[in-house]
């Protein structure tokens, strides 16, 4: 788009404009970097073969791309906050189901959920998790753009990338500490 003048907005201004989008973007950075940096490590730790690990990462990436369309479609018709919360909630549920289905420590804590250790279900849950979690990045960008002037879209996008990056720096450290 052509703008007469590009505006400026700093991170503090982004937070004032939308605390939800900025905090959510930071958390999105954490989860995306943890997923893409340690997803393979986790799969290897539960004895997946090299092919299964490759397939898992392929499915994560495909789900993240494919789910952009339906999530984006609904976010254009329903309040974006609702979609952000819905995607986050669904991602959390699928994440828990993936952990339980992998047969790791959560299942050994006598959860009331009786889901067998099944690689296929693990693949399904992780794919659905990625499908819900990855589009949150674009939802946050769209949400912040709903509340700023067009001249600030580029600056807001850059600021949101920085916020995402700060979360992405922390993600692998937080996740690896929790995996131990």
Identify what each model region corresponds to.
Residues 43, 74-75, 176-180:
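Interfacial helix-cap and linker-helix signal at transmembrane-aqueous boundaries
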Residues 61-69, 168-169:
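Residue-level signature of mid-helix packing/kink "hotspots" within the transmembrane helices
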Residues 19-25, 30-42, 46, 52-53:
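Helix-loop boundary and gating motifs at the non-cytosolic
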Residues 55-64, 160, 164:
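Transmembrane alpha-helical segments of major facilitator superfamily
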Residues 82-97:
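Structural signature of the two symmetry-related core transmembrane helices
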């Amino acid at each position: 788009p052509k703008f007469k003048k590009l505006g400026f907005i700093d991170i503090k201004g982004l937070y004032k404009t939308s605390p939800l989008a900025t905090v959510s973007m930071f958390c999105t950075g954490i989860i995306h970097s943890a997923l893409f940096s340690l997803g393979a490590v986790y799969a290897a730790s539960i004895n997946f073969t090299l092919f299964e690990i490759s397939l898992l990462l392929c499915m994560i990436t495909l789900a993240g791309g494919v789910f952009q369309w339906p999530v984006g479609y609904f976010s254009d018709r329903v309040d974006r906050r609702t979609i952000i919360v819905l995607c986050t909630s669904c991602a959390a549920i699928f994440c828990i189901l993936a952990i339980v289905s992998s047969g790791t420590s959560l299942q050994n804590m006598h959860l009331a959920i009786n889901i067998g250790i099944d690689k296929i279900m693990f693949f399904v849950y992780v794919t659905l998790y990625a499908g819900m979690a990855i589009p949150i990045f674009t939802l946050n960008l769209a949400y912040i753009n709903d509340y700023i002037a067009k001249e600030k879209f580029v600056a807001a996008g850059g600021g949101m990338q920085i916020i995402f990056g700060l979360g992405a720096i922390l993600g692998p450290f937080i996740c690896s500490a929790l995996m131990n």
